[in-house]
Amino acid sequence: MIVLQAYIKVKPEKREEFLSEAQSLVQHSRAEEGNAQYDLFEKVGEENTFVMLEKWKDEAAMKFHNETAHFQGFVAKGKELLSAPLDVVRTELSE
């Protein structure tokens, strides 16, 4: 199992647009085969800082996700929504 935590800093004026885009991404990603979890949380005490928590069955499932239209669209849109580059932490859980 692959676990990704993506720390996302959003421009304050783009917050609502980001949340709308992220909600769509979460919905589509959860429907993918190989996805075990896909959730967005706002970091406590840090307004406009979010954590996307993803769990994938294996490398192939994660690779497939990274190539989907909904993920690629979110990444492209992120350039105008984010105030800092993504900080992604990857861990692997033994089964």
From Swiss-Prot:
Q: Which family does it belong to?
A: Belongs to the LsrG family.
Matching entries from SUPFAM superfamilies are given as: Dimeric alpha+beta barrel
Keyword field contains Metal-binding: no
Q: What lineage is this protein's organism placed in?
A: Bacteria, Bacillati, Bacillota, Bacilli, Bacillales
Q: Which organism is it from?
A: Bacillus subtilis (strain 168)
Q: Which gene encodes it?
A: ycnE
Top-level enzyme category = oxidoreductase
Induction comment: Strongly induced by stress due to exposure to 6-brom-2-vinyl-chroman-4-on (chromanon) and less strongly induced after exposure to 2-methylhydroquinone (2-MHQ) or catechol stress.
Protein purpose: Putative monooxygenase that may contribute to the degradation of aromatic compounds.
GO MF annotation, one: monooxygenase activity
Keywords in alphabetical order, please: Aromatic hydrocarbons catabolism, Detoxification, Monooxygenase, Oxidoreductase, Phosphoprotein
List the protein's name.
Answer: Putative monooxygenase YcnE
Q: What top-level branch of life does the organism fall under? A: Bacteria
Q: Which residues does the UniProt record annotate as the domain ABM?
A: 2-93
